[in-house]
């Protein structure tokens, strides 16, 4: 996994891969779009959104 811009369905797919069965907490207000779409985010940042 390389740090990258993740937007829309790509962001959701990445969360499914990272979080697996734990699932994830996704709301536009959580800042994940700013962190991962506007900016570049890492695997570790994505894990912060797992349940």
UniProtKB/Swiss-Prot annotation:
Q: What does this protein do?
A: Insulin decreases blood glucose concentration. It increases cell permeability to monosaccharides, amino acids and fatty acids. It accelerates glycolysis, the pentose phosphate cycle, and glycogen synthesis in liver.
Quote the InterPro entries the UniProt record gives.
Insulin, Insulin-like, Insulin-like_sf, Insulin_CS, Insulin_family
The answer to whether keyword Magnesium applies is: no
Q: Name one GO molecular function term.
A: hormone activity
Its keywords, alphabetically, are: Carbohydrate metabolism, Disulfide bond, Glucose metabolism, Hormone, Secreted
Its GO CC terms? extracellular space
- Main subcellular location: secreted
Keyword Glycoprotein in annotation: no
What cystine linkages occur within this chain?
7-37, 19-50, 36-41
| Protein name (record) | Insulin
Family in the record? Belongs to the insulin family.
Q: Where in the cell is it found?
A: Secreted
Subunit and interaction comment: Heterodimer of a B chain and an A chain linked by two disulfide bonds.
Taxonomic lineage of this organism?
Eukaryota, Metazoa, Chordata, Craniata, Vertebrata
Instruction: Tell me which Gene Ontology terms the entry assigns under biological process.
Output: cellular response to oxygen-containing compound; glucose homeostasis; glucose metabolic process; positive regulation of protein secretion
């Amino acid at each position: 996994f390389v740090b990258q811009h993740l937007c829309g369905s790509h962001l959701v797919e990445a969360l499914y891969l990272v979080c697996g069965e734990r699932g994830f907490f996704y709301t536009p207000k959580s800042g994940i779009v700013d962190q991962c779409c506007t900016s570049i985010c890492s695997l570790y940042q994505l894990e912060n959104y797992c349940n």
